[in-house]
Amino acid sequence: CGSGGVWHDWQAAMVSRDEGVPKFNKDLIKIFEYNDSDGLEQIFIENKDEIAAIILEPTIYEKPSSSFLQKVRTLADANNSLLIFDEIVTGFRFDLGGCQNLYNVKADMVCFGKGMGNGLPISAITGPNEFMKFFDSLWVSSTNNPEALSLAGTISVINEMKEKNTIQSCWRIGEKLFNGWNKIAKNYDLNINMIGYPIRMTIQCKDNNENDSMELEALVLQEMIKQGIFLAHGKSFLCYSHSEDDVVKTLNSFENTCKFINKIKPNQSYEHFLEGNMPKTIWSMAIPPTKKSFS
């Protein structure tokens, strides 16, 4: 499938819903755990001269250790492999220069999207000419290739970001939400914490045994929605239009939710208080079996 009978998607071979994806695609992908540079190095040892590129998001919610990204860069260079950053989410959100600039690690190629156009349909694959020139020998087509509105819009968006310091504003507002949320959770002795970054955070709910609790998360989201706060999948991405009043309203709603949850008796299940069906996991990324939760 795909134009001209050509189709390739490394990510489709990684997810749990992979019906129809040839097994050889999976065999071409080696997965390592984030922040495990030793594991990545072992992959290079076991697949000497066979690794074309390392592809990763420089960060999602787990923060990179002090030397992780630098070690990944070193391993790529030592093995003549490309380092490719997926900055579809982090680019133009964490920093105007993306995580490359934030963590001072230069990738060979970087993918951008979403934030650079403020909702307009645009994305970009970037890199130096020594790598980008190979696109001249490939047939790359896109429905929106001749569409110039998004290009003009993106230039305006980036100029606005520079002039109004929008990213710094989002970090500042995000810190108030992030810290305020976790303070409330601690005050009510509930393991309902925001993890990640003030600019990109998500709810992590755990039961008394420190296991992830989807039931508790579903209940939190339900009670927040009742008060006009919609946290899609428990995630929060701050944007420039969010105000301090929005943060105050969100935190007040969360405190009301905590009060409600604390009234639930120990022998009662969170699921009992759901007014709809329990959410179900539709798909998941393939990750190493030793993957641990983080905070």
Enumerate the language-model features and the residues they cover.
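Active-site PLP attachment segment
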Residues: 103-135, 146-153
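PLP-dependent enzyme catalytic core of the Aspartate aminotransferase-like
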Residues: 162-164, 223-295
